[in-house]
């Protein structure tokens, strides 16, 4: 009968056979299960690490894009403000040009009116001189026709003044 190990009643052959099967099972598990399982775990670990790296890169890129967008927005605001300032300046310049043109036109109209008034005045003076000359000739002819006394001269002058006043 085979010897017992440590006082147990299990034969040594059974223990050796069980140990052999167990070691064989460990070798087979290591070769067929543990190796591929560890490979899968390693791949999974690498995949997770790659995903984390990609997420960190994407996060950094997103932060960079956000900062670029902020800069672009800031620049757009500055450009918009400059555009508004240019438009205001252009409006003021245009206003000044319009006011200057209006003043110039008003001066032109005023000068034209002054010239027209001067021309009308000269025509009125010429007409008055013509009437005075005509009346002077008429008075002279009346004086020549009759010899005037002092009373007649006064009356003639008053009549002449009256005629000149009515002619106006």
Curated annotation (Swiss-Prot):
Alphabetically sorted, this entry's keywords are: ATP synthesis, Cell membrane, CF(0), Hydrogen ion transport, Ion transport, Membrane, Transmembrane, Transmembrane helix, Transport
InterPro entries given in the database record: ATP_synth_B-like_membr_sf, ATP_synth_b/b'su_bac/chlpt, ATP_synth_F0_bsu_bac, ATP_synthase_B_chain
GO MF annotation, one:
proton-transporting ATP synthase activity, rotational mechanism
Give all cystine bridges in this chain. none
Gene3D superfamilies given in the database record? 6.10.250.1580
Q: Which residues cross the membrane?
A: 9-29
Q: Where in the cell is it found?
A: Cell membrane
Does the keyword field hold Ribosomal protein?
no
- Function of the protein: F(1)F(0) ATP synthase produces ATP from ADP in the presence of a proton or sodium gradient. F-type ATPases consist of two structural domains, F(1) containing the extramembraneous catalytic core and F(0) containing the membrane proton channel, linked together by a central stalk and a peripheral stalk. During catalysis, ATP synthesis in the catalytic domain of F(1) is coupled via a rotary mechanism of the central stalk subunits to proton translocation.
Q: Which PANTHER family match?
A: ATP SYNTHASE SUBUNIT B, ATP SYNTHASE SUBUNIT B', CHLOROPLASTIC
Q: What family is it from?
A: Belongs to the ATPase B chain family.
Q: What is the protein's given name?
A: ATP synthase subunit b
